[in-house]
Amino acid sequence: MDLAELRALLARHARADMSTAIDGVLISKVERQSPPATSMSGTVMALIAQGAKQMALGDRVYEYRAGQYLVASVDLPVTGRFTRASADMPALGFGLVLHPPTVAELLLQAAPGDLPPVPGAAPPGMVVSDAPDELVDAVIRLLRLLDRPRDVAVLAPLVKREILWHLLTGEQTGAVRQLGLADSSLSHVARAVRWIRDHYAQSFRVEELARLSGMSESAFYRNFQAVTAMSPIRFQKQIRLQEARLLLATHPHDVTGVSARVGYESPSQFSREYRRQFGVPPREDAARLRGTAPGRVPAVV
C-alpha cells in the first residue's frame, strides 16, 4: 500500500478546524504528541496516513496507525491522543462522517449475496482494521477533488458512496451495515444513546430506556454494554462531564451553576468526578480553558 500521495494531499489541504470544501470530509494534521483529551467520537470512518492514535472507550483501548482505519458507528464519549506525531513527521488523518440514510440507501441497492454475512450480536461501537488498497484508492481520488473545485459538487458524492461501499463489503461490514438498518441492535442502542445525549441532566431508570429502545431490560443492558463498553449510568456521567467542560470554557466563574446545569445535585461530587475524568479540578480547568471553547469535531480523526 502506497500512502505517499495520501499523505501529500492531507498535508496540503489540512486546516486548523479540520474542515474541507467537501461536505462530511475532515482532515487532521497534528505536529506533536498530545495528552489524552475527552470528546465525542462522532459517527465516522477515520483513516490514518501517518502517525498513530489511541482511543479509549470505557475499558477498551483502540490503537490505529498509518494504513489502518477506525469506524465509530455510534456517537460515543471517548478519550484520545496522538502517540506518534512531530513537527518533522506530523500525524495525518482522513475522516468521513457516516450518515445512516446514505448507508440504508446502499443496502437497498445491494443485490442478494453482495454483502458478507454478519453475526447477530450487536457489534462494538468502535472497530479498527487494516485499510484495503481499494479503500485507500477511493480516499485519494476523493481528496484529489479538492484540487479541482469545479468537480466537487458532481463527483464527490459518487466517490463518497464508493468509500461507503468498500466499508460495507469490508472487514467491518457489521458495524457499518447496522448504521443503516432501522431494526438492528445497534439502532436500538443508538436510540437510547441519543436520548441520554439530549436529556443528560435528567435522571432515568434503565427499564425506561429499555422500553424506549424496544428491548427487554436484560437484552438492552447487554447490547448497550457491547456497543458502548459502559453501562447507561456511566455513559450519562461521561456526557455530563463533557458538557460541563464545554460550559466551563464560557462560564469559568460559575462552577456550582454548571454542575447543577448538567444534572449534579452535589457540587462536591461534581468536582470529584470532574477531577477524576480530566485530571484537574473544574475551577483550575476552567481558568485554563477560558476563551478556548473546546470543539465538537469528531475525536477519532
Show the residue positions of the predicted features:
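A short, N-terminal "cap"/entry segment at the start of jelly-roll beta-barrel domains
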Residues: 1-29, 34-36, 119-124, 151, ...
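Basic/polar phosphate-binding segments, predominantly the helix-turn-helix DNA-binding elements
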Residues: 162, 166-172, 179-181, 185, ...
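Short alpha-helical segment immediately N-terminal to, or the first helix within
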Residues: 195-199, 246-250
